[in-house]
């Protein structure tokens, strides 16, 4: 708000990374923090001149960034609801999830939405239960599955008491999850509208979908802000920390995690996908694993290499080509 207000008034604005001003605070013995001291420290940073400015992104980038971050929070809310649904099912019908490859398949959720509890499933007409299964699975599942589910409901060793309370909770949680699913769909459409305004080819990188590409672009903004791929790696906070003193040099360095958490999360998700995708990055992951690296360490290495690929694609503004970038 302050930036927008001052910009509208015609002031020249410099945005300074708060890490730089906060580092100056650590020089003082007393770690007091208030508005007056914060203003003084910012003035000191400017007086010493040892700072770099951060440029603000254009309006479309900022709008897309807001939507992507909001989507991330909605996804987190949906994940929490799924965990609560899963917990309730473990209590009242622990055998149910084993009937499907995933509890969240449309067939599974269709049955849950209709019956909610194992008692209701057990008492449901078999033909009615089968119709739901047939419809939701697009005729892939047979009557045998309906019989199997009803038998499991009859023989469950889940909690038998307070079924009404569990049923009420499930109904509310499923309704909320469905509502969030619709919100995510609407958000995806809005995000893609913004993404398509840019001449961006991040989605051509194997393992990076359209929404992931939009998230990464929104967090990076103008690629010209970064002098090299190493600078982008540092901005994402996936650069290793350096621990050296005299002749000692640490061999177990962790990621700095000092950059954008949203960018880091998006890159790591993409790196995880790339690690198992038929691509040069998959070969790189296997190479690290063959060297005895832990899965997370190998994925971190893939994330850094992927960030270099992202940098090249944005810098050159052209689609991903394995021979060019890897």
PLM regions and their residue ranges:
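A detector of single, family-specific signature residues
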Residues: 1-326
């Amino acid at each position: 708000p302050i930036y927008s207000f001052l910009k509208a008034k015609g002031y020249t604005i410099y945005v300074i990374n708060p890490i730089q001003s906060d580092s100056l605070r650590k020089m003082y013995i007393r770690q007091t923090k208030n508005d007056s001291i914060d203003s003084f420290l910012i003035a000191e940073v400017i007086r010493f001149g040892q700072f770099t400015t951060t440029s603000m992104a254009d309006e479309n980038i900022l709008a897309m960034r807001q939507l992507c971050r909001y989507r991330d929070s909605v996804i987190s809310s949906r994940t929490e609801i799924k965990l609560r649904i899963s917990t309730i099912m473990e209590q009242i019908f622990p055998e149910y999830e084993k009937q499907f490859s995933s509890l969240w398949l449309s067939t599974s959720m269709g049955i849950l939405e209709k019956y909610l509890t194992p008692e209701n499933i057990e008492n449901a007409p078999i033909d009615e239960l089968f119709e739901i299964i047939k419809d939701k699975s697009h005729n892939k599942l047979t009557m045998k599955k309906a019989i199997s589910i009803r038998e499991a409901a009859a023989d469950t060793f889940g909690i038998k008491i307070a079924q009404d309370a569990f049923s009420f909770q499930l109904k509310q949680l499923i309704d909320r999850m469905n509502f969030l699913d619709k919100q995510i769909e609407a958000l995806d459409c809005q995000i893609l509208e913004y993404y398509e305004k840019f001449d961006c080819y991040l989605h051509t990188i194997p393992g990076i979908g359209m929404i992931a590409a939009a998230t990464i672009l929104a967090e990076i903004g103008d690629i010209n802000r970064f002098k090299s791929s190493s600078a982008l790696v540092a901005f994402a906070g996936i650069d290793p920390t350096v621990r050296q003193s005299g002749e000692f040099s640490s061999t177990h360095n962790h990621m700095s995690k000092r950059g954008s958490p949203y960018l880091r999360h998006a890159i790591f998700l993409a790196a995880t996908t790339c690690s198992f995708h038929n691509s040069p990055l998959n070969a790189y992951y296997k190479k690290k694993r063959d060297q005895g690296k832990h899965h997370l360490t190998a994925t971190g290495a893939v994330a850094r290499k992927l960030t270099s690929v992202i940098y090249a694609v944005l810098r050159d503004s052209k689609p991903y080509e394995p021979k060019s970038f890897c």
